[in-house]
Each structure stands twice: as C-alpha cells, then as structure tokens.
C-alpha cells in the first residue's frame, strides 16, 4: 500500500511539474493586447463622422497621454512594424479587420493600440506605415475614406 501511495504521489508531482513547465514555456508576458473598447469607439466614431459630416478627433476619443499615432496598413508584417518602432512589436490581435493604430508616448513606447473594424479605409497617408502627431490626428471621413484633415 505504501509503495502505491508513493507511486501515485510521484506521478502527481510529475504531472504538476509538467503543467508548470508548459505554462512557463508558453507564457507571453510582453504581449500588448489590443484595446477593444477603444477600437469599438473609434470604429463607431468613423461611421458617425461619415454620416454627420463632422471631423473625427482621435485625441478626443483617446483622452489619455500619447503624443504620436502610427497608422498601419492591413497585412504589414510585424518585422516592419518593429523596424519602425526601433524595438520588437509584440502586439496581440486575435484577427485583423483593418488598419491598426498604435498610440505612442513621447519616448516612443506604446501607450495603447487599436484596430479599425469598419468597412472604410485610410487615404492620404503614407503606406504601409504613416506617423501623425497627436495634434494632426484629426480626420475627415467621406464615403468611408478616412483622411487627415487639412490644417
């Protein structure tokens, strides 16, 4: 009986150790998750600006601290985003529906990122990656074409 209990205990210890090792090896501590609420707000505001003929101010939708935005064309490889940022891009997006917008702090670190989930597209910006200052992140939407507002 004692041998059986020792064998069961050893098997359980190995199982728990194996699970802990699997979790440790597959963890992704540095991944930056997409801000779903911000993505939905931006997508809704694009549709509203198109319908109402109003401007879309990204700074008003994202009122927290950030200084620049990168507008990333769909299908842009992570390696290209990493080159532009100057460090590895670890953004996690379950599925890509449109352009990614990466909000950067003054030091170049990522504040947050969102993805545009509507039927429109960005126009009048550099591809595959455009950079705009916060003050320039005001857009006109016409026929679901999102373009920076002329200053």
Positions of PLM-derived features:
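C-terminal partner/receptor-binding element of secreted or periplasmic proteins
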Residues: 120-151
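N-terminal export/targeting and maturation segments
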Residues: 2-80
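Compositionally biased, low-complexity repeat tracts
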Residues: 13-14, 82, 116, 139
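A residue-level detector for conformationally permissive "hinge/kink" positions
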Residues: 9-12, 100, 135
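Mature extracytoplasmic domains of secretory-pathway proteins
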Residues: 52-119
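Functionally constrained cores in energy, signaling, and assembly domains
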Residues: 28-29, 105, 123
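Generic alpha-helical propensity signal that fires on short helical segments
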Residues: 19, 84-89, 122, 128
């Amino acid at each position: 009986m004692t041998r059986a209990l020792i064998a069961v205990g050893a098997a359980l210890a190995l199982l728990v150790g194996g699970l802990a090792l699997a979790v440790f090896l597959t963890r992704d501590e540095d991944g930056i998750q997409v801000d779903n609420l911000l993505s939905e707000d931006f997508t809704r505001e694009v549709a509203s600006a198109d319908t109402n003929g109003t401007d879309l101010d990204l700074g008003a939708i994202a009122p927290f601290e950030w200084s620049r935005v990168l507008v990333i064309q769909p299908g842009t490889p992570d390696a290209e985003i990493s080159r532009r940022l100057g460090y590895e891009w670890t953004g996690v997006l379950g599925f890509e529906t449109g352009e990614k917008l990466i909000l950067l702090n003054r030091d170049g670190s990522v504040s947050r990122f969102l993805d545009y989930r509507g039927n429109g597209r960005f126009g009048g910006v550099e591809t595959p990656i455009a950079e705009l200052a916060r003050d320039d992140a005001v857009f006109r939407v016409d026929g679901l074409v999102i373009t920076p507002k002329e200053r």
